[in-house]
Amino acid sequence: MAPRCLLIGTPSIAAHPERLDQVYEIHHRSSTDLQMLDRIAAGLVNLPAATYDVVLLLADADGTTRESHKLFSRDVMNKVASALKIGGVLKSQAGPFQGAEKTEAILAGLTETEDGMAKPEQEEPVSIPLKFGKNKANGVSATNGTNGAVNPDGSVPLNLNRKRDQPEPVKPAGVGFVDFSDDLDDPIITGEDDDLIDEDDLITEADMARPVVQPLECQPKPGKRRRACKDCTCGMKEKLEAEDAAKRSSADKALNSLKLDADDLAEVDFTVQGKVGSCGNCALGDAFRCDGCPYIGLPAFKPGEEVRLLNNDIQL
């Protein structure tokens, strides 16, 4: 079975397919994968774990490593190291790794070999028993307590009268007393002058500019709305809140467009102007009708026009 190989190219080499054809003459296409370094750095590509025997970092279109040096960060190196099999090798087309790239490879767990940066085998931890023998260090046997003395008959004498080490008495737990009689003139150390490190200073501009990779748990499932985690740190919570605020503001604008202000309302008077109210002028409107007039609430009508009230329905 041919060894699996991963080719990592820079954006500049994508415009020169002849460079890739030269590489494919050495590495067979059926067992070789090609990924772009900028897509790996942006988190758009996930490399499979423990898959490749060889990872080859291609040089730039001009034969240098300037572009790859800018994109080959610690995060990218960790992804490449995890994609290597045990014993796999990371190589560079431009030559051995130097400087920061070599340091990042070592920090990712790779070791320097003649072929490149190899992924070593992880040995299982071995427990080593430790024997503490104070008598053996002094040349005294732990069995008989003597310096190797033997009786004429071959027996080993036992020194039963030897003084044994007495353990120190355990001090009772209680309130301790501190003697300040000899350091009254010394200044009291309060710890206010200790240098404190601001955690914001540890974040560089490159870390802030790095795109946020959305975890697989935060990606929406088919048929379900996206929901942010309780302790969301990928920005999904802020994004959803901004979307909800935008939808709420657009709905408020649509609702306000349907509301009528006081200036938009007009009062319509159906009464006939210039008439004096008295009984018999019911056709002129409510202003000329009595309190008990049966036409209260009806619009004005022509004098002499017949008005019928049938089942509370007005018929003129």
Curated annotation (Swiss-Prot):
Region ranges (Fe-S binding site B): 279-293
Source organism, top-level taxon: Eukaryota
Organism of origin: Pyrenophora tritici-repentis (strain Pt-1C-BFP)
Pfam family, one: DRE2_N
Single annotated GO MF: 2 iron, 2 sulfur cluster binding
Protein name: Fe-S cluster assembly protein dre2
Entries under InterPro entries matching the protein: Anamorsin, CIAPIN1, Dre2_N
The record's note on its domains: The C-terminal domain binds 2 Fe-S clusters but is otherwise mostly in an intrinsically disordered conformation. The N-terminal domain has structural similarity with S-adenosyl-L-methionine-dependent methyltransferases, but does not bind S-adenosyl-L-methionine. It is required for correct assembly of the 2 Fe-S clusters.
